[in-house]
Amino acid sequence: MADNILLAKRFGCAVCPLKQVKNEHPNMQPTGTDTPVLYFLGEAPGLDEDKYNKQFRGQAGQRLRADLYTFIQPDDADKYIRWNNIVRCRPHDGKANRTPTSIEIECCKQSVYNDIEKTKPLVVVGFGGVPLKAITEGINIGIWVNRFIPVKFGEHKCWYYSCYHPSFLIRQGNSYTTEYDRYFKICLKNVFDFVTKNYEEPAIIEDGHTDNISILYTFDDVIKALDSLKSEELVAFDLETDSLRPFEGGKILTIALSTYDRTYAFPIYNYWKDEDFKKIKDKLYELFLSGGGFIAHNLKFELEWLYDMFDLRLLMEGKWHDTMVQAYLIDERTTKVKAKADGMFKLNILTYLNFGFKLKELSNINIKNITSSRIADILLYNGMDAKYTYLLFKKQNKRLDKSLKICYNNLIETTITLTKAQSKGIIIDLDCVDKYIEKYTAELQDLSEKIHNLDEVKKFEDMTKKVFNPLSPEHIVYVFEKVLNIPPKVLTKKKNYSTNDFVLGEFAKDGYKIAEYITAYRKTNKLKSTYLDNVKELANNGVLKPVYNLLYTQTGRLSSGKDSNA
């Protein structure tokens, strides 16, 4: 596959599989203006486009044009917009359209890039995941819809703006149509507002990523650098650690501090003489309490390590900032849980969104096993993290209006409080835990005996040659449907026999003891497995240290989660 991709990049149309596919208008050329403000980029021509030799003429194209014409007159559209597809021949299987392959995309996209460079639009508006993947090399469309990404085609810098493909809206059917329709129109409005009211030149940092990063290996250099930062109004900092949390032997490997124009990175763990390390710690402590503001990306993570290294005073008296909190507030999506899961608020993605490069691609280290990397590589990566955290803070801070800054300050205070709560932990009465484990274990054994003494369960085991599992929906369905011959009361979304708690409750009302016992077994097992079984393992020396989350909860309320290092 890799060799085929290289051939496709080099020879283009000459080696494209679509050359062998019969089409009425192969190699369809762009239409619209030669001096576009907007460059509309689709996936590939469909049946109607191939027939009429013009982009966006099928059902999806008509849908797009209908919404588009609420913002611009039909006669004016081609004066400001250029229309093209990332693949210029219709991909199909002889009957229906299909998604173009990666080889077909590689064969065609350079000619599209050349056209964008030549016509110099302000914004390339991409519809669907295919053009997005081609231009950004694999980013998921779900997190990039309604996002402006700074990109470069040859020597031309512009923005890439991602929209859902109109055919996606058509496929959703009635259940989603209203919401997706609304959002699609919002996206189109946003791109028109951007070019007519709010346009700014794309900022792409192409080189110099490691400029002004000083790697410090001597005691005198570290002390001098720390002293020089005391007068700074703002300093970004970043820690590289060997684990997620500072418990059970976790270590800070390196630290970096940056004002963007100068960045210092130096080792922490297992490098200095004891007396020198104590002096470095004292200088760091003085610096963090010197009166300036200190910026982190994911402040709660960094503060938990600093609390472990220093004390509570540092948390409570330091002046802290968080670029992740900024990004969270700037992001207008209501479902931010999904955005976090997709990595939308990671520094690597935010540098791409704001500065046009992916930070991880500049590093030689293995993030998942950082201790396997050379210390020099870790320090350089650490320095870049701090450097671009500083720059990101400056840029995002301009986007926080007065009301968002109030929210921001409140979230910073909450972050400090949650860090304190996490670090101090919750004292657990382990003797009490043991008593409850013993109690629920006995209850489960009693219920299990009652269940396995039922005639229908014995018949199940005779028929299937399996031991009945009261937590298995498959086993429960078999007993009700094939042993007891009871029709379903409720079907699941997939039209299967439901055995949820409501259904079992109804069966229990009908006098079926198996339903009553299984319901009780489920409840008791959940109490034991969820709240007791892992407590002794997680409660180090009788203290449980949960992870508290505030930014990315579904309901907006505080949630918590366990951590393998807790």
Q: Where do the protein language model's features map onto the residues?
A:
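A polyanion-binding, active-site-adjacent surface
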Residues: 2-197
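A short acidic-Thr-Gly-centered motif at the start of a beta-strand
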Residues: 28-33, 153-154, 217-233, 283-288
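Short hydrophobic beta-strand that contains or immediately precedes a catalytic carboxylate
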Residues: 39-41, 235-237, 320-321
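Acidic beta-strand-to-loop metal/phosphate-binding motif
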Residues: 122-128, 236, 292-299
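Alpha-helix capping/helix-boundary segments
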Residues: 130-132, 301, 475
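Metal-dependent phosphoesterase core characteristic of DEDDh/y 3'-5' exonuclease domains
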Residues: 136-146, 160, 164-170, 258-260, ...
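Conserved "right-hand" nucleotidyltransferase catalytic core of DNA-directed polymerases
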Residues: 197-269, 337-342, 354-358, 368-566
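Nucleic-acid-processing active sites and adjacent nucleic-acid-binding tracks
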Residues: 260-294
